[in-house]
Regions:
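Start-transfer (signal-anchor) and selected internal transmembrane alpha helices
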Residues: 1-31
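Short hydrophobic/aromatic helix or loop-helix immediately within or flanking a transmembrane segment
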Residues: 56-81, 85, 89
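Membrane-interface micro-motifs in multi-pass membrane enzymes
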Residues: 59, 63, 87-90, 112-158, ...
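Juxtamembrane "helix-exit" motif on the non-cytosolic side of transmembrane helices
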Residues: 37-43, 73, 102, 123-133
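Membrane-interface alpha helices of multi-pass inner-membrane proteins
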Residues: 165-181
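Extracytoplasmic catalytic/substrate-binding loops of multi-pass membrane glycan-assembly enzymes
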Residues: 31-51, 57-69
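Alpha-helical transmembrane segments
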Residues: 19-34, 113-120, 171-172
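Hydrophobic transmembrane alpha-helices
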Residues: 95-103, 147-159, 173
Length: 181
C-alpha cells in the first residue's frame, strides 16, 4: 500500500510540475470561482455560524464531522472570503487528486485530457452551487476529498492489495465525511 501511495504522490507531483496544467487550472479556478469568492452571499445560517459551531447546534443535526473540522481549524465565526478561498483551493486539490488517479490508471502522457477534466470539474455549476448557499462549504469539499481518497484506496485494495482489514478501516474512515453533510 505504501508503494501505491508513493506512485500517486509521484503522479500528483508530475501534474503540479507541468506548467501548462498548473497555470490553466489556476486560470480556470479564478474565472470560475473568483466572483463567488469576492462577491459572497449572506444567508441566515451564515450569520449564526458561531452559534452552530460554538454552541454545538450543529451536533444536534448529527453533523459531528463538520463540528470537528471547524473546531480543529478554529473556525467559529463567519468570514466568507477565507472560507470560500479555502473551499476553492480544496476544489482545485480535489481536481488534481482525481486527475492523478486517471493519469496513473490510463497512463496517458498528454496533459490535455487532465486539463479538460480539471477545467470541467472546477467550473461545473453543480460543483459550484454550494458556494452560494452553504456556510459549511469547506466541510463539503474536505469530505469530498476524503471520499475520493477512500474510493481510490478501495479501488487499489480490490485490484492490487486484497487486504480485507483495509475495507473495515476505510469504512470507519468514511463515517467522517458522511457526518460532514
Amino acid at each position: 500500500m505504501k508503494q501505491i501511495v508513493k506512485e500517486y504522490l509521484i503522479e500528483i507531483k508530475d501534474l503540479l510540475k507541468n506548467k501548462k496544467y498548473l497555470y490553466t487550472i489556476i486560470f480556470i479556478s479564478i474565472l470560475s470561482l473568483g466572483f463567488a469568492i469576492t462577491h459572497y452571499s449572506i444567508g441566515v445560517d451564515d450569520l449564526c455560524l458561531n452559534r452552530y459551531v460554538s454552541d454545538t447546534y450543529i451536533l444536534s443535526q448529527k453533523r459531528w464531522g463538520t463540528w470537528l473540522l471547524y473546531n480543529m481549524l478554529n473556525i467559529n465565526e463567519f468570514s466568507p472570503f477565507w472560507l470560500d478561498f479555502l473551499t476553492a483551493t480544496g476544489l482545485v486539490i480535489l481536481a488534481v487528486i482525481v486527475s492523478a488517479f486517471i493519469k496513473k490508471e490510463t497512463k496517458e502522457k498528454s496533459v490535455l485530457p487532465y486539463i479538460i477534466f480539471s477545467g470541467v470539474f472546477i467550473s461545473s455549476p453543480i460543483i459550484n452551487n454550494f458556494f452560494m448557499y452553504q456556510s459549511t462549504n469547506l466541510a463539503i469539499v474536505i469530505s469530498n476529498i476524503i471520499i475520493i481518497i477512500c474510493g481510490i484506496l478501495i479501488y487499489n485494495n480490490y485490484f492490487k492489495c486484497k487486504r480485507k482489514w483495509l475495507y473495515i478501516l476505510i469504512g470507519i474512515g468514511m463515517t467522517i465525511p458522511i457526518a460532514m453533510y
